Each structure stands twice: as C-alpha cells, then as structure tokens.
C-alpha cells in the first residue's frame, strides 16, 4: 500500500504539471 500511495502522489504531481502546462499554452493562444 505505501508504494501505491507514493505512485499516486507522483501521478497526481504529474497531472498537476500537465494541467498547468496546458493552461499556460491556452493562455498564450488566447
């Protein structure tokens, strides 16, 4: 379970970064 929690946190951070990048790209386009 601890390893899964760690993976979930890493995945969450990756999702946050990807979302931020996508929002920044959209902001640059608009």
Curated annotation (Swiss-Prot):
Give GO cellular component annotations, separated by semicolons: chloroplast thylakoid lumen
Coarsely, its chief localization is plastid
Instruction: Give its localization.
Output: Plastid, Chloroplast thylakoid lumen
Provide this UniProt record's keywords sorted from A to Z.
Answer: Chloroplast, Plastid, Thylakoid
For this chain, the family text in UniProt reads: To A.thaliana At4g02530.
Name of this chain's protein = Thylakoid lumenal 13.3 kDa protein
Q: Which organism is it from?
A: Spinacia oleracea (Spinach)
Q: What phylogenetic lineage does the species belong to?
A: Eukaryota, Viridiplantae, Streptophyta, Embryophyta, Tracheophyta
């Amino acid at each position: 379970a601890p390893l899964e929690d760690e993976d979930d946190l890493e995945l969450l951070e990756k999702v946050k970064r990807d979302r931020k990048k996508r929002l920044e790209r959209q902001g640059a386009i608009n």
